[in-house]
């Protein structure tokens, strides 16, 4: 008999199991497939989103921003490669510029740190090889990437080291 059953051994299930395994509880991680990270987690984009696209004030916004802020330390603890390369949303015309302004306002409301709108010149200084048609951008320096497969394997492994069963 277990105190907690974590359903799914993807990146979310792995991180939940890892976090809960720090407490004095018995945990069973249940996975339908024959290995961890074989579903959506192995096929996702690897982007750690900054949080500017989530609905203002939503739980998703809160957790995305907080998760983005935590990810570097979590990866360091688990020995997983983490790259804080930032993210850019590129605009090509006035309509795109208005969309980027909306994303900027939403990101500010969601407390995304250091978010800024870039002019064409600022964009080219940051990314010299960007399309000649690009006119503006939204820059989120807190955006990053991490291999979801490696993160899942490490987090499930850490949970198991702490006594969780898979």
Question: Which sequence ranges carry the predicted segments?
Answer:
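Alpha-helical scaffold segments in soluble metabolic enzymes
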Residues: 19, 70, 102, 154, ...
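Glycine-rich FAD pyrophosphate-binding loop
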Residues: 21-43
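Short phosphate-binding/catalytic loops that engage adenosine nucleotides
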Residues: 25, 112, 164
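Short beta-to-alpha linker loops that shape the active-site pocket of alpha/beta-hydrolase fold enzymes
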Residues: 33-35, 123, 155
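Helical element adjacent to the flavin cofactor pocket in flavoenzyme catalytic cores
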Residues: 138-166
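N-terminal Rossmann-like FAD-binding beta1-loop-alpha1 element of flavoenzymes
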Residues: 2-29
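Dinucleotide-binding Rossmann-like beta1-alpha1 core, especially the glycine-rich loop
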Residues: 46-126, 135
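Proline-glycine-enriched beta-turn/loop adjacent to the NAD(P) cofactor-binding site
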Residues: 10, 33, 46
